[in-house]
Design a protein with these regions (language model features):
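Alpha-helical scaffold segments in carbohydrate-active enzymes
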Residues: 61, 65-68, 261-272, 301-308
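Short, charged, amphipathic alpha-helical segments
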Residues: 253-260, 288-296
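Active/binding-pocket-proximal capping segment
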Residues: 276-285, 323, 327-330
Length: 415
């Protein structure tokens, strides 16, 4: 748990080291939720209790268990998109979210579903709660739950999406797809039993709506996520620059201008992350918390910068990337021809092919497109993120200047 800005900066370095080990392609490594659980344990008092259990104590004890046993937690908060025009309790299928169907002295039984649970197949536990941007209403009380459960709970089903790897191709042809396909899954609960000791919210709409924000998890998991985002953006930016150089395009002013936009974008994101740390605050529990407004600025902007880096790489690599041969061709009859035809004064044929394969995998393969989609939407609805950023903007200095100018104008007006 960070107590000073130096602690937060140290966590930044740890997040960065983990992200660099996977080139920023794994969005939900264990450090994401583990940092949130550490903070939840400190702030858990708001969870209160009911006639069966002490929710605050449950959160604290679970955090200790996670730390002691090095538990990898995945999470699922988004409800399936079935009918957004109806309240969640008015959708008859029972799969519009996860809801309590029975409770007794030992715990609760839940059924329902959550979508886009990343890393579920390899995680140990699953944390379930509701998204803060889609608030529950009073009639939704059975859906007002937050709990943790092992993913091997007999009542939990993991339904994975289609794989994006290429098992018949080598890792040289698909260096990302064949190594870093982070699996997303649809999670179904079928009368799954959750003991009270692992329940943090139950039958309490207000607490369900407050859980992610008031727990402090949002700010601290956002910090981890944006450090990972920097790493991913740095890979995409560096790849565009390397492509331009290897293909002999970096001497043209127009290309340099495109690349300069990418490097400027990267610096802006790095600077904003630093601002989130330097302008953080010590909360009432003594936790040094990053500036969420700065982090949300990154979340609303980084996906577009990442998208731009991919598009620049596509435009520069173009036909060279689309027509790149399988690396297996270098072991066949065409090896001599390819070595002669594709070698330049800037790269051997094999180096050029490896680079173009990487460019295709990141920008144009199914894996690459999933990564782009993930970057846009994994942090929540981009429209809501920007609307909330506007609502929380601190423009006191700007408004004071406007008021001063208007006041000066009035003072010089003869009525």
């Amino acid at each position: 748990v960070p107590r000073t800005v130096a602690d937060l900066q140290q966590k930044h370095r740890a997040y960065q080291e983990i992200a660099q080990s996977n080139s920023g392609m794994l969005g939900r490594t264990p450090d994401f939720l583990n940092t949130g659980m550490a903070v939840l344990a400190e702030r858990a008092a708001f969870l209160g209790q009911n006639q069966y259990t002490d929710f605050a104590a449950n959160a604290r004890n679970y955090a200790k268990e996670v730390k002691a046993n090095d538990i990898f937690i995945s999470h699922a908060l988004q409800n399936p998109q079935l009918n957004r025009q109806k309240a969640i309790n008015a959708i008859p299928s029972g799969y519009a979210g996860v809801h309590t169907i029975e409770r007794n002295q030992d715990g609760i039984f839940v059924s329902g579903a959550k979508m886009v649970n990343t890393m579920a197949p390899i995680a140990d536990d699953l944390l379930i709660f509701n998204p803060p941007e889609l608030l529950l209403e009073n009639g939704d009380s059975s859906y007002a739950v937050a709990f943790a459960t092992p993913l091997n709970n007999p009542g939990v089903k993991i339904i994975c999406r289609k794989l994006l790897d290429h098992p018949t191709a080598s890792i040289t042809d698909y260096p990302l797809s064949n190594a870093l396909d982070e699996i997303d899954a649809y999670i179904v609960f079928d009368h799954a039993f959750i003991p009270w000791s692992k329940v943090f919210v139950e039958n309490n709409v207000e607490m369900s709506n407050r859980f992610f924000i008031d727990s402090g998890m949002f700010s601290h998991t956002s910090h981890q996520d944006e450090v990972r985002g920097i790493t991913k953006l740095e890979l995409a930016t560096s790849l565009a620059l390397r492509i331009a150089h290897i293909l002999g395009l970096d001497g043209f002013l127009g290309v340099q201008e495109k690349l300069g936009r990418l490097t400027a974008n990267l610096e802006l994101i790095k600077g904003t992350i630093t601002r989130s740390e330097d302008n953080g605050h010590l909360d009432e529990f003594g936790i040094y918390t990053p500036n969420l407004q700065a982090l949300q600025a990154v979340r609303s902007t980084l996906p577009e910068y990442y998208d731009e880096a991919l598009r620049v790489t596509q435009h520069l690599a173009a036909g060279s990337m689309v027509g790149v041969p399988s690396f297996a061709e270098f072991d066949g009859d065409n090896a001599t021809i390819l070595n002669q035809a594709l070698t330049t004064d800037r790269a051997t044929a094999k180096t050029r092919t490896r680079l173009l394969n990487l460019a295709f995998d990141l920008t144009s393969s199914g894996f690459g497109q999933r990564q782009l989609m993930y970057e846009y939407y994994h942090g929540g609805d981009p429209m809501r993120i920007r609307a909330q950023h506007y609502q929380r903007a601190d423009l006191q200095a700007g408004n004071q200047m406007i008021d001063r100018l208007l006041s000066a104008d009035n003072a010089n007006t003869h009525e």
